[in-house]
A protein has these predicted regions:
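Bilobed "Venus flytrap"/periplasmic-binding protein-like clamshell domains
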Residues: 1, 52-110, 131
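Hydrophobic residues within well-ordered alpha-helices
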Residues: 17-18, 53, 69, 117-119, ...
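Short helix-initiation/N-cap motifs at beta->coil->alpha
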Residues: 4-15, 101-120
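Periplasmic-binding protein-like
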Residues: 46-54, 140-173
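Solvent-exposed loop/turn segments at secondary-structure junctions
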Residues: 10-13, 29-34, 58-61, 82-86, ...
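Extracytoplasmic small-molecule ligand-binding "clamshell" domains
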Residues: 1-29
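Extracytoplasmic
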Residues: 8, 12, 19, 48-50, ...
Length: 173
């Protein structure tokens, strides 16, 4: 086999797959019913993303688990309803109706905004992927490393990831 690779943004990848510009995309995509309608998704995952919460270091004793965050009525940075992270929090809330996490819909924002909003106290946490936090904040060459002594991250769970395949006759095979 010979593959042609194209580096692109997450949004462009999804649009490109849907339009047929790309045949397959790997972006650490989580399974959602909406994605399963648009794309062919293999039955077996190829990896996993560890999702968790970026919080202020001063709050790391207060928020050690998702249950702590919910019980303390932590305020979460808004999430786009199209983002698979929305489904993760919705699923948590369905199972924990006594102490749900308030979800606020967002159109879009920059990750730098999310970190800044947590630091300034506008929100208590940003629902973040571990690898993203490590590359952006904890890595010495990370673009937000200046926040490393002010932010902390704790895990929620691992979520299987899948390649997404353009839905057409060729992709169905």
């Amino acid at each position: 086999y010979q593959f042609e690779y194209t580096g692109t943004s997450d949004d462009d990848l999804l649009i490109g797959l849907e339009s047929g510009k790309y045949d397959i995309g790997t972006k650490g995509a989580w399974y959602t019913d909406e994605r399963a309608k648009k794309f062919v998704i293999p039955s077996e995952p190829v990896g996993a993303s560890i999702i968790g919460f970026t919080v202020r270091k001063e709050d790391e004793q207060k928020y050690k688990t998702i249950d702590d965050f919910a019980k303390n009525k932590g305020k979460l940075v808004p999430i786009s309803p199209q983002n698979a992270q929305w489904n993760v929090i919705t699923s948590y809330n369905e199972k924990h109706q006594d102490a749900p996490i308030e979800l606020t819909a967002a159109e879009s924002f920059k990750v730098a905004d999310a970190y800044a909003w947590v630091l300034e106290g506008r929100y208590d946490a940003f629902f973040d992927i571990k690898l993203s936090f490590e590359k952006a904040v904890t890595a010495e060459d990370g673009p937000y490393h200046q926040y490393a002594d002010k932010l902390s991250w704790f895990p929620y769970k691992g979520i299987p990831t899948y390649p997404l395949i353009h839905r057409d006759e060729k992709g169905e095979k």
